[in-house]
């Protein structure tokens, strides 16, 4: 295995009671990303996306005065089945890690299977917690109806 391919892999799964098309779209919409792509104590997030293969994205997660920038490039966009992108941040030692997400149709909605590869071993637990929290927030947002009280 080359140094570029080295690292750890984690898998996070969650069923969200919303159709695949809607869940998939949430991953490519900057306004939507800014609402749920904020794990743990993050209070806000901003996102810029160019949703095409080879397009880039930038997400800045905000926790008080601190800013955590994440960036990457879309490698695969197959609506509503699969999304794959590089994920680069300070937490990954500014190395390109790879996130692949499968959107599986289930009776209860959509099962997300997120596989994050090439992670530094020291970051597996924190990324597992972060992705789990992000999926919970995505589920809450996806299930909400802005018109309801």
Regions found by a protein language model. Name each.
Residues 1-43:
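Hydrophobic ligand-binding cavity/cleft-lining segments
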Residues 5, 117-149:
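A conserved amphipathic terminal alpha-helix motif
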Residues 23, 33, 57, 74, ...:
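Hydrophobic pocket/interface hotspot
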Residues 81-88:
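Short, solvent-exposed secondary-structure boundary/capping segments
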Residues 88-93, 115-122:
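Short, solvent-exposed aromatic-acidic interface loops
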